[in-house]
Amino acid sequence: MADISVHPSTWPLYVWLSLLVALPAVTFLYDAVTWFRMPPGPTPLPFIGNKLQLPKSKPWVQFQEWSKKYGPIYTIWIGRRPTVIISDPAIATELMETRSSKYSSRPRMVAMGELLWDGASILVKPYGKEWSVRRRLLHLALTPKALRLYKPVQEAEASRLAYGLLGRPNDYVKLIETFTSSVVFCVAYGHRIDSLNAKVIGQRFEFMHYSASLNVPGKYLVETIPALKHVPDFLAPWKKDIKKHGLKEAAANMDLVDVVRGDIARAEQESSKEKLPDSLCKILLEMRETENIPLSDRDFSFVPASLFGAGSDTTASTMCTAFLALITHPETLEAAQAELDAVIGPDRTPAFEDEANLSYIRALVKEVLRWRPVAVLGGTPHASTEDDHYEGYYIPAGTTVLGNSWAINLNEEYYPNPHHFNPLRFLDGNIAARVKQAPMTTVHLGEKHDLELGGKAHPSKSGHSSFGWGRRICPGANLAANSLYIALAKLLWAYDIKPIPGRTYDTFKYTEGFNIRPQPFECIIRIRSDKHKIVLEGEMEHAETYLEKFTPFGE
């Protein structure tokens, strides 16, 4: 028998051949044992997993189909890395909220998280102290008290949106994007947006689209072989390009902080600091003067910047979905306007103080969020940090956990006839105690609907799963919900939003990507009466006066 205890360079050829066979065999055996212990899913191929079975377009639809075959929790494999897909809100809540101490991290994202952002963004930060610091700072702008302070801004911006549609109804998408962007920039930096041609808006959309392009499974080999991140830039042009974009975004973020720093300095010189609008960036800069914030200037600048991605584009996409829902389900517009006419009347537009009395409008906002969730795959995936078991299945540490919001929000066990847009699902004050009612029941608005209130009770208070779960839930969820309420309430009070006669609308025709919105469509947006127009013109004057203190960013 050959002695192989000596240096490997002296080993016989058959020893090397044996190792070449044994190592893959042992690896395959280990993966197979793990595969059998995890929630069952489509059979993976050795070493490449289910890559060949993953669709290049709209994977959430395929994931929904697999849930019908394999159940509400199953596993797919990207190479040798397991991903648990969840299609039931109760399971998502159990794992990512009840057991949040185990499921609040992020999978490693080399291209986007490490090369582009160098770990600065809270979006991709693993769960731990550094994430907690950023989350705490971000929450300073999103406390209940802070959210109340932003309501006048949101009302004024919603009035500008409603007035803008008088002269530019065909530009409703751009006007909506201006509205959502301006709200977020007022909150983050104390400056408004008057036009999408503003330089800062062009930059934000460029950064957002580029980062999204990096977060595509299989696009970069570095996600499978992380060691490739250490290849010198001159040998890896793809890496050089990513880092170049990262430096550009970081510089833009720090420029915005410098703008607010300059605002504070001028206000102090002029003894007019009380006139300077509060913003997250202003609050953080003042905090930095009195306490230690363990972040570099670069990392610090990413905190207020993160509000744009969390609350601007996604809210605009939801508003576009609302328009699509209204023109394909015209009975909802009639019901909404019946409530608005009864509660508000013709002499003013709705305000936040009316929200408690506008139960149908509140329900409509929730149904929009449920019907076509923007973050179809639940936003950025979670990752487990400890070995765990669920219903007898093994979930090892390091598993990517993905809540398929598309499948969850369209789960027929919770939402009968789920593709029918029906705000009445959310009219019951206690959503968790919904009771199935007979179809075509007449409600107090005089509207007839298939109430579709049967099914299981959703575990969350909101009744849907569109903002994520647990410690990783979207921090701007309440800010976004407030913007949706006030904008839709004012627009439905003022306008008839209807389909073009003879036009067919496809409610499944949405963009690609991890955040979706309807493909561009035309509709009729017509002011309801001359009196409504006069009210909008008057409220526009008040809105412009209020927003004067929020200096606009230039083009």
Which residues does each predicted region cover?
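N-terminal membrane-proximal hinge/A-helix region immediately C-terminal to the signal-anchor transmembrane segment
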Residues: A2-W117, K129, V133, P152-R160, ...
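Cytochrome P450 I-helix active-site segment
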Residues: T43, G202-M208, Q269-K282, A325-A375, ...
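Cytochrome P450 catalytic-domain "roof"
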Residues: K58-V84, S105-P126, R136-I193, A250-E270, ...
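Cytochrome P450 heme-thiolate monooxygenase catalytic core
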Residues: S105-L115, R148-M319, A335
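Cytochrome P450 heme-thiolate "Cys pocket" and heme-binding signature region
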Residues: A120, A305, F352, E391, ...
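Cytochrome P450 catalytic-core helices
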Residues: T180, T314-T332, Q337-E339, N478-W493
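Cytochrome P450 heme-binding "Cys pocket" and the immediately downstream C-terminal segment
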Residues: P330-T332, A477-C523
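Conserved cytochrome P450 K-helix/beta-meander segment immediately N-terminal to the heme-binding cysteine loop
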Residues: G403-G454, M540-E541
